[in-house]
């Protein structure tokens, strides 16, 4: 989250002209990322980048067991300009961590949410959701300033507060199934959600949805179906990863929210495209099943 500066203005006299409003400083350009594929020790699930171009990632460990408490998950960083990943936390610290936001790593870990210092790896807050009996807390996103988490196995989404260790459910008016990626649209004031779901025959049935956090109404955004994972909102469009299009450029797609049209944007195959990010003109995509992180240009027409 961005800190808001507090400006103190002193009036010199009753006739003094009103102070000129200070304009915000232009954002510094992000350091460029080069196209690359980086091998990871374990299965990477989510990524994020800071203003210095360092890429943080969460790894569920050597085995693809995101719902088990096996103590082999860890957090790592790929320093800008390097292709050598480094571990931030010890390998026995976490079970299946996922998610990152802002200057801290906010990790969903089976039935817990942790707030972890991105530089030191120290745990600075947590929320225990085990009383709700879930085993697959998944994506994290700041929704209008509040941290929200999806619970894929119990078909729920929660607001969580790592400072007070409290949480509460956002109960939608229409059902959601296997919720995964979350994103916030500050213009429309809605939550975007994608589902990692299949029907009774094993056919992909996940939807792209919007949720009004006030009315709690759920709206379907597209007739497409998939096994959706990562979700990013940018410039009136949704970018989303789809496990049903594994190993194809369609593994990451873009939905134009004005026209309803979608198109592939990955510029190379990814095996197990998980919780990705957009970084200027590039995307950083974890290849969860192939134990790699891909840095590639964003393709497709806008």
Stretches with model-predicted labels:
Residues 23-41:
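A short helix->beta-strand "capping" segment at the edge of beta-propeller domains
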Residues 32-38, 83-89, 122-130, 166-173, ...:
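A short beta-strand motif characteristic of beta-propeller blades
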Residues 37-71, 95:
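Beta-strand-rich domains and repeat architectures in extracellular enzymes and scaffolds
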Residues 41-52, 89-105, 130-148, 175-190, ...:
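Beta-rich, blade/repeat-based domains predominating
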Residues 65-72, 150-153, 199-205, 244-249, ...:
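Short, solvent-exposed loop/turn segments at conserved positions within beta-propeller repeat blades
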Residues 66, 71-76, 112-114, 156-158, ...:
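A short loop-to-beta-strand structural motif that recurs across blades of beta-propeller domains
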Residues 78-83, 117-122, 161-165, 212-216, ...:
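Short loop/turn segments that connect beta-strands within beta-propeller blades
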Residues 112-162:
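Hydrophobic alpha-helical segments and helix pairs
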């Amino acid at each position: 989250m961005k800190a808001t500066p507090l400006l103190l203005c002193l009036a010199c006299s009753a006739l003094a002209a009103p102070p000129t409003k200070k304009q915000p400083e232009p954002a510094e350009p992000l350091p460029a990322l080069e196209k690359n594929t980086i091998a990871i020790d374990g299965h990477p699930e989510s990524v994020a980048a800071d203003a210095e171009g360092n890429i943080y990632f969460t790894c569920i460990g050597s085995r693809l067991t995101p719902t088990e408490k096996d103590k082999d998950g860890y957090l790592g960083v790929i320093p800008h300009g390097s292709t050598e990943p480094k571990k931030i936390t010890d390998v026995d610290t976490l079970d299946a961590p996922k998610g990152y936001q802002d200057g801290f790593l906010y990790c969903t870990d089976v039935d817990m949410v942790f707030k972890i210092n991105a530089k030191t790896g120290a745990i600075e807050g947590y929320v225990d959701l085990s009383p709700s009996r879930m085993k697959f807390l998944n994506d994290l996103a700041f929704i209008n300033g509040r941290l929200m988490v999806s619970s894929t196995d119990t078909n729920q989404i929660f607001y969580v507060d790592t400072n007070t260790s409290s949480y509460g459910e956002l109960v939608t008016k229409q059902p959601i199934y296997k919720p995964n990626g979350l994103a916030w649209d500050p213009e429309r004031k809605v939550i975007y959600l994608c589902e990692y779901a299949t029907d009774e025959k094993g056919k992909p049935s996940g939807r792209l949805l919007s949720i009004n956090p006030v009315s709690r109404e759920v709206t379907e955004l597209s007739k497409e179906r998939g096994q959706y994972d990562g979700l990013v909102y940018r410039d009136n469009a949704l970018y989303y990863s789809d496990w049903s299009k594994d190993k194809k450029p369609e593994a990451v797609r873009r939905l134009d929210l004005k026209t309803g049209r979608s198109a592939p944007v990955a510029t190379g195959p990814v095996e197990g495209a998980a919780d990705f990010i957009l970084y200027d003109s590039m995307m950083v995509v974890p290849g969860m099943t192939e134990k790699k992180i891909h840095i590639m240009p964003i393709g497709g027409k806008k």
